[in-house]
Regions:
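Dynamic helix-loop-helix/coil hinge segments at AAA+ ATPase domain boundaries and subdomain interfaces
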Residues: 40-64
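Phosphate-binding P-loop
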Residues: 44-46, 70-78
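Interdomain "pre-motor" coupling segment immediately N-terminal to P-loop NTPase/helicase cores
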Residues: 1-43
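Catalytic acidic motif of RecA-like/P-loop NTPases
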Residues: 56, 141-145, 160
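AAA+/P-loop NTPase substrate/partner-engagement loops
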Residues: 101-148
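Pre-Walker A adenine-sensing motif
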Residues: 60-74
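Walker A/P-loop nucleotide-binding motif
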Residues: 75-97
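Conserved catalytic/switch belt of AAA+ P-loop NTPases
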Residues: 128-129, 146-171
Length: 171
């Protein structure tokens, strides 16, 4: 007879080694990558009460982001965006404001920590294989690295694109 401990170990071994299918539900507005190499996208509860109109002193940046997001949602060329500024400058608030404004048009957000950037290709594949007509902005707060950093090379590779890259629904 097999012990419960051995069954538990075998179950954990298989769970760690099997490729888990990741689904994106169109009803979920935001996800966060969690779990490292064997991770998945976990739903985030997002407060949509903050709107772009609540953000003051950054009207030029808001206008550019709104235009870029509209183009992205319409399937037109859109640019990757790198927002810089000190802590509390409103970068995360801009993303929440964009989500509040455009979620009804299919905009969704995927948050990725800097140390998980090497999973961007996996996330790109998930979006590519998802049939829900949503458009996903990948948001990474607190980007800081040097040219030798593996995360930098990964991000640059994804941003530069590949022949099979899913740029129509992932920004």
């Amino acid at each position: 007879m097999i012990s419960a401990e051995l069954i538990e170990l075998a179950t954990q071994f298989l769970k760690d080694r099997t490729k888990q299918t990741i689904y994106l539900d169109k009803e979920i507005l935001a996800y966060r990558w969690s779990g490292g190499r064997h991770g998945s996208l976990l739903p985030i509860d997002v407060n949509l009460s903050l709107t772009l109109d609540d953000l003051h002193g950054i009207d030029g940046q808001k206008a550019q982001l709104i235009q870029n997001t509209r183009q992205f949602l319409q399937g037109l060329p859109a640019n990757h965006v790198l927002m810089t500024g000190s802590r509390g400058a409103g970068k995360s608030s801009l993303i929440r404001g964009l989500l509040a404004k455009f979620y009804s048009q299919g905009l969704r957000v995927i948050e990725v920590a800097r140390d998980d950037l090497y999973h961007l290709d996996k996330i790109r594949q998930v979006v590519k294989n998802t049939n829900n007509n949503c458009h996903y902005i990948v948001f990474c707060d607190d980007l800081a690295f040097n040219v030798e950093d593996e995360n930098y090379r990964t991000l640059k590779s994804i941003l530069d694109g590949a022949l099979d890259s899913e740029q129509e629904r992932l920004l």
